[in-house]
């Protein structure tokens, strides 16, 4: 469901100016009793385009909490600069994808594993990430095309990791831009 938003949105004591026209997509929804639900729209940046997500939640500070769960995404060249500036690199591709090639100094913790013709979520993902990174480490997160890394980034933000940045597009544009890789 898409709609155009007014130029100013106000939710409780939180207000934000919104550039018209923007789209709303119904993505994040939490299962809460209908009596406690509130609907807000938060910015989501994926593949270098801004979108707005309709978020349903019953928490007091809905806008701030919803926005905290939407990771920042950056193009691969910016991600490379962040890595050079000291950010740690988390590659969430499968071990097979990682072994074919990966960005220099990346640490592999799969977000999903291949099972038959499909994929299943790694049930130990948060525990494995926590064994390599602290909650306040600055981390860039990448995968093959940008989808798994966005999901992983969102999960890490929800779990309390604060320095999470998603790599828009993933490993494909990384190699297309001839950025350094290890095999």
UniProtKB/Swiss-Prot annotation:
InterPro entries cross-referenced by the UniProt entry: Rhodanese-like_dom (IPR001763), Rhodanese-like_dom_sf (IPR036873), Thiosulfate_ST/Rhodanese-like (IPR052367)
Domain of life of the native organism: Eukaryota
PROSITE patterns assigned to the protein according to its UniProt record, in alphabetical order: RHODANESE_3
Induction data: By darkness, ethylene, cytokinin and heat stress.
Any Pfam family matching the protein: Rhodanese
UniProt domain Rhodanese: residue ranges: 83-183
Function: Is thought to act during the early stages of leaf senescence.
Protein's recorded name: Senescence-associated protein DIN1
Gene source species: Raphanus sativus
């Amino acid at each position: 469901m898409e709609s155009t938003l007014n130029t100013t949105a106000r939710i409780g004591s939180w207000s934000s100016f919104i550039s018209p026209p923007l789209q709303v997509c119904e993505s994040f929804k939490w299962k809460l009793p209908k009596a406690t639900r509130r609907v807000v729209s938060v910015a989501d940046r994926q593949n270098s385009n801004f979108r707005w997500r309709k978020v349903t939640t019953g928490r007091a500070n809905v806008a701030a909490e919803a926005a905290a769960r939407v990771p920042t995404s950056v193009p691969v060249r910016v991600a490379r600069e962040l890595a050079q500036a000291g950010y740690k690199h988390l590659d969430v591709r499968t071990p097979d994808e990682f072994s074919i090639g990966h960005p220099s100094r990346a640490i592999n913790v799969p977000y999903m594993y291949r099972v038959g013709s499909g994929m299943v979520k790694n049930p130990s993902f948060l525990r494995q990430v926590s064994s390599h990174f602290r909650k306040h480490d600055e981390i860039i997160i990448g995968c093959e095309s940008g989808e798994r890394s966005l999901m992983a980034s969102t999960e890490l933000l929800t779990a309390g990791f604060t320095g999470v940045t998603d790599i828009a597009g993933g490993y494909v544009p990384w190699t297309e831009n001839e950025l350094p890789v290890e095999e």
